[in-house]
């Protein structure tokens, strides 16, 4: 078994001799700042507990069973050459390490940013809800203040009805007054016409009588009769005196 693993490693090194030199400096470059930065290393117990917590399962037994099964499958795959450790495994491990670091260190930052955005949106929604509630309360207060509008409307309707009735009566009186004035005007004109007709008739009658008298006075017989009648009247007056 060991000879097979050795042959596989040698073959992989011959096929890809340039991968390991490129990967190892990268690993050394990544590892050197870690040890030279002076950051205190994490407690192994805490690290182990975080690894156990990251495993799927609801209790310690299930997580242990999953971890044991994964280790057994890995050993079985490596021992039967179902999977061979090569430079691709190193690259995959590096990628997984990078992604794990991003998730571990960037996750809290992203969670903080997401929480801030969520709080911001919640504050906006709460403010909008409060404004809407206040607007509704204000509207309800305005409507309550207008609760007496029905009585006022009824009173105004009664007043308008009475006003319409008075206007109708005033219009009727105005029409009657206008009709009476027109009738008076017609009657006055008729009276004036009759007066003018009577005056004309009287004038014509007087002219006719005067003309007739003047015509009779031109007759000598009539003048003689008038003179005799006048003398007789004078004698009667003298005899009575």
Swiss-Prot record:
GO cellular component term, pick one: mitochondrial inner membrane
GO biological process: protein-containing complex assembly; proton motive force-driven ATP synthesis
Keyword entries, A-Z: CF(0), Hydrogen ion transport, Ion transport, Membrane, Mitochondrion, Mitochondrion inner membrane, Transit peptide, Transport
Family annotation (InterPro entries): ATP_synth_Bsub_B/MI25, ATP_synth_F0_suB
Stretches of the chain forming a coiled coil according to its record: none
Function statement: Mitochondrial membrane ATP synthase (F(1)F(0) ATP synthase or Complex V) produces ATP from ADP in the presence of a proton gradient across the membrane which is generated by electron transport complexes of the respiratory chain. F-type ATPases consist of two structural domains, F(1) - containing the extramembraneous catalytic core, and F(0) - containing the membrane proton channel, linked together by a central stalk and a peripheral stalk. During catalysis, ATP synthesis in the catalytic domain of F(1) is coupled via a rotary mechanism of the central stalk subunits to proton translocation.
Molecular function GO labels: proton-transporting ATP synthase activity, rotational mechanism; proton-transporting ATPase activity, rotational mechanism
Ion transport in keyword set: yes
Similarity remark: Belongs to the eukaryotic ATPase B chain family.
Predominant place of localization: mitochondrion
Gene encoding the protein: atp-3
Organism expressing this protein natively: Neurospora crassa (strain ATCC 24698 / 74-OR23-1A / CBS 708.71 / DSM 1257 / FGSC 987)
Name of this chain's protein: ATP synthase subunit 4, mitochondrial
Signal peptide range in chain numbering: none
Compartment(s) of residence: Mitochondrion; Mitochondrion inner membrane
């Amino acid at each position: 078994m060991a000879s097979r693993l050795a042959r596989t490693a040698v073959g992989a090194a011959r096929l890809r001799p340039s991968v390991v030199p490129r990967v190892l400096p990268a690993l050394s470059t990544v590892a050197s700042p870690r040890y030279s930065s002076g950051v205190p290393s994490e407690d192994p117990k805490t690290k182990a507990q975080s690894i156990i917590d990251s495993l799927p399962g609801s209790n310690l037994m299930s997580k242990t069973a999953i971890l044991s099964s994964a280790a057994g499958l890995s050993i079985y795959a490596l021992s039967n050459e179902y999977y061979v450790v090569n430079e691709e495994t190193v690259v995959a491990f590096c990628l997984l390490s990078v992604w794990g670091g991003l998730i571990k260190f960037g996750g809290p930052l992203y969670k903080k940013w997401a929480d801030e955005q969520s709080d911001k949106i919640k504050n906006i929604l709460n403010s909008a809800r409060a404004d809407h509630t206040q607007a509704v309360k204000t509207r309800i207060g305005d409507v309550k203040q207008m609760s007496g509008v029905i009585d006022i409307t009824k009173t105004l309707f009664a007043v308008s009805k009475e006003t319409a009735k008075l206007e109708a009566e005033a219009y009727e009186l105005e029409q009657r007054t206008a009709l009476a004035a027109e009738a008076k005007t017609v009657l006055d004109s008729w009276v004036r016409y009759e007066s003018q007709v009577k005056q004309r008739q009287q004038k014509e009658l007087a002219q006719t009588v005067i003309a007739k008298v003047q015509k009779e006075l031109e007759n000598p017989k009539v003048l003689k009769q008038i003179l005799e009648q006048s003398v007789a009247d004078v004698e009667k007056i003298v005899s009575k005196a």
